[in-house]
Amino acid sequence: MKYGIIKKYFVVVAALMVGATSCLDKMPESAIPVDEAMQSFDDAEQTVTGIYSMMKSSALWSGLITLLPDIQTDLVYAVDGYSNTYGQHWLWNIRSTNSEVESVYAALYGIISNCNFYLEKIDGIIAKQTLDEKITILEQYTGEVYAIRALCYSELLKFYCKAYDPATAENELGVVIRKYYSTPERSVRASLKDSYEFVLSDLKKAEEILDPDYDGYNSPYMTNAVAHALHARVALYMQEWDEAIEHATEVIERDTHYILVPANVEWSGGMSYFDRMWNYDFSYETLWQVGFTTTSYGGALGQVFLNFNNDFTYYYPDYVPAQWVLDLYVSGDLRYNAYFATLSTGYDHGLQWPLLVKYYGNQDYIANYIYHVTTPKPFRLAEQYLIRAEALCRKQNPDFSGASKDLSTLRENRFASGGSVSLSEENFIEEIANERIRELYMEGHRLQDLKRWGKLYRGGEGFTRTPQKSSLSEGSSISIKADDVRLVWPIPQHELEAPGSEVVKNESNN
């Protein structure tokens, strides 16, 4: 079944895990008409629970959104003999009918549709409440839904739109903005400027509604701090440097809730607090992580890097870290041993290589024979330090001293000792780019970074892959410049052809 943007009814099935569709023209037997759905406090709570459940999808943070932006670029190499998982992205053969391109688009708009449904109904439910406690809870839910909708639109903008340039954004294509659930809306793309402004509008509502008292590390729910963290990220993408600094600082200064966890302090059994974040999905610096449990989880982030459960004897990685990435980690950088381990593979060529073990899997899940499943952590405090450092360097009056302090603070928590760094006009973009790789490796930032930096980074030369040991010959010598139209994913073909669609395609659709 092909998915589209518009949904005309609310399906209550599998915890409300539904998507939008443009090819269904009648109500299924399992559906509840819109005017009969979400009538009570309990209904509202169930709807929000369903939205969070949808966010576990392997098309999103537990899979495609996290992995493809880094696999597509220069951070990994496909191994000779690999399973061809994500092969079209590795080869830059990205088509409008590509299943990953369709899945990400459908999953994000599916969540947006459910958010719109909730927002359409919630005022009527709040008006019927007589207990202040329930009103407060519903208002909190509403803030969470605004934050979720903003997050989903921000992801669509990352994948399916050009990088934001304030000078041209008004004339560039954004995304189709769906504000309502029942009210008909044209299937037409807004400008890039208006699309980003809509995200900011939702974030401002979330920031106003969400009570900071509910902030807390390891939260499976949207919080006030998460809204500010997303605001900082979006502002960075928009080149609104002061705004990015303001919101990143808002998060960083909440040090009673969040702190950078040290890789140089033991937590237990030889494992550091930083190791604990990846081995047990517990960290004081995680602002929001998808709400996985051993009985309810999404994709397995570590699968393509290990594939140990093929025969439970050898590793069969589809992708291994690029040598140049491994070389970025200098002596004393404890992230190296937290992220990588040299292991033998089961391939005939016998490759032995530092494999990515960052996503080896939560130890509690492994004890239940669930392999390579790590809870996605889309918002960590570390990213806020990186955002603020870059914004401090790129604002009208750069503050390289302040930026150096931010990077040094992050690195001092990741190194056995030392870690300080000094930024200047000459080296800041290379240093920040490298630190973003070291810290955020395989967390889904590289594609957007290359796109938004453009000529600032490596003169716009982008990257060139150079074959490494046992790498797949096809794709290992690709060169991609920063202005390559394929940095923007194509709009799914079925959206262009859907009845009533006025959606304009991207250059990469050609």
Where are the regions that the model predicts?
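Short, surface-exposed recognition loops and adjoining beta-strand edges that mediate ligand/DNA contacts
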Residues: 34, 38, 62-80, 124, ...
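Extended ligand-binding clefts on enzyme/binding-domain cores
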Residues: 194, 238-239, 245-249, 253-369, ...
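Bacterial Sec-dependent N-terminal signal peptides
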Residues: 1-33
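Conserved, well-structured interaction surfaces
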Residues: 84-160, 190, 208-211, 369-376, ...
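Membrane-proximal, proline-rich intrinsically disordered regions
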Residues: 22-72, 309, 316, 325, ...
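TPR-repeat structural position
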Residues: 196, 241, 398-400
